[in-house]
Each structure stands twice: as structure tokens, then as C-alpha cells.
């Protein structure tokens, strides 16, 4: 089951000019629509509170309906809920929808998957100026590669507060390269770089563990990264059910998905080697 919401960016222009009663601007205003798809996922996890309790205290605690209300059950449920969210976050970039799959990575299309799809459709490209070809990023060239990439962004994007989403290894290489390059320059007071050098503190570096092995880096605004969940009403539940005297079922159904609000050059610049090769040097041969 799929939930869909149309999002997008309004395009058009309007300008004041010298007073002229006869001048009328008839250029239209349009919306470039994009569809945020959320997919219904489900999981049933059977567990035994008594088994968990016995590993610590060596005795049983309860049975029947009372199992649902003991502290150890609440602790296990809190743990499972947190793991559910953590596993979705772990594949937020790399997930690829596979209806016959059983894992979080099969539930929805992540941002890297969407990026590759749009590249293959020529909607993200150098010609459209929302893509820039980069070299593999190593500790010897990271500063130059990221600065060149940032300077290739549209002027509108560059004057906006942006985030540069990169693998953790790319950030490590950037810090090492920065230290080796300007380590003794007086104005350098810290090697922990939060913003990209020469971006006037407009480009925040965002290293992500869930982008490991990625073929892309993304320069965009936080508001352009849409994550959809909820609003499934009666189809969405997180609950505990008891169908066995000593065991409980953790049952969860929810919608989840991701999308860019727009892929226009004013809001997004993608850096890649060839759309497939990991951007971090030394990965993938």
C-alpha cells in the first residue's frame, strides 16, 4: 500500500519597472510537482518477557495479560521501538523499494536511490546545473574537491544556508587535508570543521554514517529533504498483543518514505564521480 502527497516548487518571476499603464506581465507561474511516496510497512516481533527476566534474575515474573504491564516488557518495547527507527535511519539514503523484501532497506526509496533514478532520467545532470562531476575524495584532495564542488553551485544556492551531506570518511579526509594544508596558518584555531572553508559559514558539513559507500554528496537546504511518515490512520499501529500464555507480540505498521521537494539547481547540487563509484577514495576498488 502506498501513500502519495504532491509537493514541489513554484516557479515564475515578477519585477517592478518604470511606471507604464499599458504594460502587463503575462508570463505564467507554474509548479514543478514531485510526489512524496510513503509505503506501508509491517513487522511482528514475538518475545518472552520471562526469558529476558530469567537471564538476569533466574525466575519467572508473570503470565497471561499481566505480562503486558511489567517493567521489563516496557523496557523491551522501548528498545524495539528505538531499533525500528534506527534501522529506518540507517537506510535513509540507500534503501530501494522491493515489494518482496523483508527489511527496512526494501520498504522505500532512499535519497541516493532517488538521485540515481533522476540521473538516469536526465533530470539531474551537468547540463541542468544540478550535478557536478568530482574526483574520488581522499585525504590529499578533500579540501580542493569540496571547495570546487561548492563553487559550482548556483549563486542562489550559494547565498542560502545549506547543508553538505557527506559520508563520515569524506569528512575525516577533509579535516586531515585541512590540517595538513593550513595547520600552521595563524587564523586556523580549530581542526574540527563545522562549515566548509570559504563558504562564509553558509555551508554546514554534515557527515553521516548512513551515507557510507555512497556514490553521491548532496548540497541542499534542510527543508528540501522530505521524510514522510504517519497519517495512515487505522492502517498504522504500534501495539502489544498476547496470543500465548508466556509470550507477547510487538506489532507495528506504519507508512514511511523520502523525497526531495525539488531538484532545481537553486535548491540542490549533487556531486558524483559517475553515479555508481563511491565518492570516498579507496572504496569499491
Question: What annotation goes with each model-predicted range?
Answer:
Residues 58-145:
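Alpha-helical scaffold segments that mediate packing/assembly in large oligomeric complexes
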Amino acid at each position: 500500500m502506498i501513500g502519495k502527497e504532491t509537493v514541489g516548487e513554484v516557479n515564475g518571476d515578477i519585477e517592478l519597472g518604470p511606471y507604464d499603464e499599458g504594460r502587463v506581465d503575462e508570463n505564467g507561474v507554474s509548479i514543478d510537482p514531485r510526489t512524496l511516496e510513503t509505503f506501508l510497512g509491517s513487522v511482528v516481533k514475538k518475545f518472552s518477557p520471562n526469558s529476558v527476566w530469567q537471564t538476569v534474575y533466574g525466575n519467572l515474573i508473570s503470565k497471561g495479560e499481566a505480562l503486558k504491564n511489567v517493567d521489563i516488557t516496557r523496557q523491551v518495547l522501548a528498545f524495539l521501538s528505538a531499533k525500528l527507527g534506527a534501522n529506518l535511519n540507517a537506510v535513509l539514503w540507500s534503501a530501494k523499494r522491493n515489494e518482496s523484501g523483508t527489511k527496512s532497506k526494501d520498504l522505500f526509496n532512499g535519497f541516493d536511490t532517488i538521485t540515481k533514478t533522476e540521473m538516469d532520467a536526465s533530470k539531474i545532470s551537468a547540463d541542468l546545473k544540478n550535478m557536478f562531476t568530482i574526483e574520488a575524495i581522499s585525504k590529499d584532495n578533500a579540501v580542493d574537491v569540496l571547495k570546487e564542488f561548492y563553487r559550482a553551485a548556483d549563486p542562489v544556492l550559494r547565498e542560502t544556508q545549506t547543508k553538505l551531506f557527506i559520508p563520515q570518511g569524506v569528512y575525516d579526509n577533509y579535516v586531515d587535508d585541512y590540517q595538513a594544508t593550513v595547520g600552521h596558518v595563524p587564523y586556523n584555531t580549530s581542526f574540527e570543521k563545522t562549515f566548509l572553508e570559504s563558504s562564509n559559514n553558509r555551508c554546514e558539513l554534515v557527515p553521516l554514517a548512513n551515507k557510507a559507500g555512497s556514490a553521491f554528496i548532496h548540497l541542499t537546504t534542510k527543508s528540501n529533504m522530505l521524510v514522510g511518515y504517519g497519517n495512515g490512520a487505522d492502517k498504522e499501529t504500534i501495539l502489544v498483543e498476547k496470543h500465548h500464555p508466556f509470550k507477547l507480540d510487538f506489532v507495528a505498521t506504519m507508512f514511511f518514505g523520502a523525497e526531495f521537494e525539488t531538484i532545481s539547481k537553486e535548491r540542490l547540487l549533487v556531486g558524483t564521480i559517475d553515479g555508481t563509484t563511491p565518492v570516498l577514495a579507496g572504496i569499491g576498488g
